[in-house]
Amino acid sequence: MSKVKNLLAKMLQRFGKNSSQADSQRYDSLEEIAQNQANERMLRATQVGLEEHLVICLETEAGSFYWHSQ
């Protein structure tokens, strides 16, 4: 449940950011790239049957978010 709360907090932060801050946008872009790569690795592992966990995908305007049960 804490993962879901953290995910929602991140999404709310993205929606509430001021678009005039170039440094934070750059940081967000790097963070988003890293998150997308982690999401893709997890999704690939799930698709090839390496993990037998529930995978949930939440698609928003801020991006797609994946997490799985452990």
Curated annotation (Swiss-Prot):
UniProt keyword Membrane present: no
Instruction: Please give one Gene Ontology molecular function term for this protein.
Output: ubiquitin protein ligase binding
Set out the biological process GO terms recorded for this chain's protein.
cell fate specification; negative regulation of Notch signaling pathway; nervous system development; sensory organ development
According to its UniProt entry, this protein's organism is: Drosophila melanogaster (Fruit fly)
Question: Nucleotide-binding as a keyword?
Answer: no
Q: Which keywords belong to this entry?
A: Developmental protein, Differentiation, Neurogenesis
Q: From the UniProt annotation, give the residues forming the signal peptide.
A: none
Q: Which protein, by its recorded name, is this?
A: Enhancer of split m6 protein
